[in-house]
């Protein structure tokens, strides 16, 4: 599968494989947040685009584009700097590249998952990048007028990953009683009993080793009886970095 970032002369996008760590997860007691495998997988499930410069924004609350003030005093010599184009407190960051995916694949684009910035939130979009010759922008919406919000140079400002076009349309969702799937119901009941017993044991006598304080069934990809759930269970992603160089 291909994912290419085509660049024009002077474009130097700062793209890296997404980082799995988050400062707030580091700060949880014993970094326990990393025990949640879905969080860690989501954090690293794609690529990040980094800010080309340090800047700060403040929205004065009006709908006009001029109501968003952008301080570029620390932007240095960055050629592509954030702008206020759309109004309503929306900050626009240009992506220096035309991204091209294999046929039938879109890109999901937003801010880094499980990462929070006080006073501003990333917007999300899905782009048909297998045919479009157009660039796109990463946009953030200020949620707290009157406050300065700072972005550092090389701070992740965009996160993207490929998704198959039409994937959701192929599903026929429904709600059903668990008794409809006898095997699933039995496995769920086994897990529920084991989970209750595990927590009761932890309450009676907590183990000294922090890793023994959680069951790790899902993390290890095993069913309640210890058998593997699937062969391709993922604990860590091995995403390739972008290679090559653009025009000078």
Name the predicted role of every residue range:
Residues 115, 139-140:
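Active-site-proximal alpha-helical scaffolds that flank and shape metal-associated catalytic sites
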Residues 132-139:
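Aromatic sugar-binding surface patches on proteins
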Residues 1-132, 145-150, 156-248:
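Non-catalytic terminal segments and appended small domains
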């Amino acid at each position: 599968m291909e994912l290419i970032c085509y660049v024009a002369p002077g474009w130097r996008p700062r793209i890296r494989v997404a980082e799995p760590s988050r400062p707030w997860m580091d700060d949880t007691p014993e970094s326990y947040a990393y025990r949640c495998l879905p969080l860690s997988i989501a954090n690293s499930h794609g690529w990040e685009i980094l800010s080309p410069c340090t800047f700060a924004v403040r929205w004065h609350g009006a709908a006009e584009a001029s109501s968003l003030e952008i301080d570029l005093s620390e932007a240095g010599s960055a050629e592509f700097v954030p702008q206020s184009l759309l109004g309503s407190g929306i900050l626009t960051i240009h992506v220096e590249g035309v991204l091209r995916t294999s046929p039938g694949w879109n890109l999901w684009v937003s801010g880094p998952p499980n990462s929070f910035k006080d006073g501003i939130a990333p917007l999300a979009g899905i782009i048909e990048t297998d045919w479009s010759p157009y660039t796109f922008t990463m946009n953030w919406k200020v949620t707290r007028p009157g406050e300065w919000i700072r972005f550092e140079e090389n701070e992740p400002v965009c996160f993207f990953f490929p998704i198959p076009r039409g994937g959701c349309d192929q599903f026929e969702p429904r709600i059903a009683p668990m008794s409809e799937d006898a095997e699933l119901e039995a496995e769920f009941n086994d897990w529920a009993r084991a989970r209750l017993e595990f927590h009761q044991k932890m309450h009676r006598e907590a183990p000294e080793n922090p890793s023994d304080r959680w069951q790790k069934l899902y993390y290890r990809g095993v069913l309640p009886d210890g058998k593997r759930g699937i062969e391709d269970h993922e604990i860590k992603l091995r995403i390739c970095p972008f290679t090559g160089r653009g025009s000078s």
